[in-house]
Amino acid sequence: MIERNWNELIRPEKPQIETGADASRKARLVAEPLERGFGVTLGNSLRRVLLSSLQGAAVTAVQIDGVVHEFSSLEGVREDVVDIVLNIKQLALRMHAEGPKRMTLRATGPGAVTASQIEAPADIEILNGDHVLCTLDDGASVRMEFTVQTGKGYVPAEMNRPEDAPIGLIAVDSLFSPVKRVAYRVEPTRQGQSLDYDKLIMEVETNGAVSPVDAVAYAARILQDQLQIFITFEEPKKKVEGEAKPELPFNPALLKKVDELELSVRSANCLKNDNIVYIGDLIQKTEAEMLRTPNFGRKSLNEIKEVLAGMGLHLGMDVPNWPPENIEELAKKFEDQM
C-alpha cells in the first residue's frame, strides 16, 4: 500500500502563532511534532521561498527635477542623490493593481521630507509614511516622480532601465519581496515517551504589505504547487468523509459479538453454550427462553438486561431479516457505528 509512505508519518499540529505589538509585521510560528529531519527540510525550504518568491511592489525608477544622473547633488538638499536613491529603495508599498504606476512628490523646506508627502494613486498604499527621503534647507524645494511596479525577488537597476529611458531617469534596484527577515531553528520535542521528533520555530518579519502568517502560507502554497509535478502516480481513492453508507434494516449494534459485552464468566459461558454469537441473536430471545438455558439463572438474566438497556435494547425484540447472509462483512463495514 503506497499510501503508507505518507500516512504513517506523524503530522504536525496547526502552527502556534506568537505575535508582539505589531502582528502585521512580526510573528513567531511553532510547528510540532515533525518527523526527525523534517524541521530543517521544511524550515530551509520555506525560508528560501519567503525571501525569493513572494510578490510585492517596489519603486523601479525615479526622476528628480534638476538631476541628470545619480551622482548629482541638489542645492538646498542635505543628502546627495545617491543617498536619496538609497532612501527610496526602503519605501514599503502595497499595490492593489498591476503596474506600472506613478507617484509624485512635491516638497519645500525647511525640514525633513517623508514618504507620507508622496501623492500616490488610490491603488497604492505607502506603509512607512514616517520614512525620511531627504532633508531640505530653508527655501529649498524638490519634485520627484516615482515609477512603481510589482514583481518578486531582487531586480538590479540595469534590468529596470527601459531602452527608451529619458534623460534624467534613474533606475533603482528593486527588492519586491515583502519579507524583510526570516530565521528558523529546530529543537527536539516530545511525542508520547519519545523525544525523537523535531520542533520548527520560525521568526518572520515583513514590511507590512503582507502579514508574517500569510507570508508563510503563501510560501507553503508555492512549494505545494511546485512539488505537485513530481507526483506521477494516481493516488488510491479516498473515502469521502460523510459519504452515506448503505442503510441497515436494523441497529448496527446488533452486529457486535456478545463476547464484547464484558459479561461475567458464567453469563458469557451460558450464551456461548446456547450458540448465541451476536447481540442480534441475543435480543430475539425472551426472558423465559433465557431462563431455560442450562446454568443460566436470574442473576445472569438481570446482568444481561442491564447491559442491553445501556445500549437502548432489550430481550424479546423482533429483528426482520436476521441474521443477514454476509454478517461478518457487515460487521467490519459498520464497526465504527457499533
From Swiss-Prot:
Residues 1-234 are annotated as: Alpha N-terminal domain (alpha-NTD). SMART domains: RPOLD. Keywords: DNA-directed RNA polymerase, Nucleotidyltransferase, Transcription, Transferase. It comes from the Bacteria. It catalyses: RNA(n) + a ribonucleoside 5'-triphosphate = RNA(n+1) + diphosphate. The keyword Plastid does not apply. Residues 250-338 are annotated as: Alpha C-terminal domain (alpha-CTD). The N-terminal domain is essential for RNAP assembly and basal transcription, whereas the C-terminal domain is involved in interaction with transcriptional regulators and with upstream promoter elements. DNA-dependent RNA polymerase catalyzes the transcription of DNA into RNA using the four ribonucleoside triphosphates as substrates. This is DNA-directed RNA polymerase subunit alpha. It comes from Phenylobacterium zucineum (strain HLK1). The lineage of its organism: Bacteria, Pseudomonadati, Pseudomonadota, Alphaproteobacteria, Caulobacterales.
